[in-house]
Amino acid sequence: MCAVLDRSMLSVAEISDRLEIQQLLVDYSSAIDQRRFDDLDRVFTPDAYIDYRALGGIDGRYPKIKQWLSQVLGNFPVYAHMLGNFSVRVDGDTASSRVICFNPMVFAGDRQQVLFCGLWYDDDFVRTPDGWRIIRRVETKCFQKMM
């Protein structure tokens, strides 16, 4: 029996690229949730543009955003970033993705209010000598609800 090559099948390289990018997105969430902000240096390019304005944040280049994250997230003793619906498109040494994030954030204080955020991460990536890195990230708001 002859095997017929299905042209719609992903190559091993394409599968590897997609898995590496998916892991990079998980690495972002882990770095944020564990407050290991220096780990973000292995997620973003040094000149990456990041736009968090859709949910009340700021936009700018990675160094500015990294500093802002380490300051503003101190207002929340507990938070978590849960990712899903990974849609990754690879084109040679560049790629893009759209991933949904569910992000509950507990405010400090006696009332323990929780801000539930639903958002999309729309990202562009570039392959570097050290692996894939995010070169552009824009948040798109789905919902925010305080409880």
From Swiss-Prot:
InterPro entries: NTF2-like_dom_sf (IPR032710), SnoaL-like (IPR037401). It comes from the Bacteria. Signal peptide: none annotated. This is Uncharacterized protein Rv2910c. It comes from Mycobacterium tuberculosis (strain ATCC 25618 / H37Rv). Gene3D superfamilies: 3.10.450.50. It holds the Pfam family SnoaL_4. The lineage of its organism: Bacteria, Bacillati, Actinomycetota, Actinomycetes, Mycobacteriales. Was identified as a high-confidence drug target.
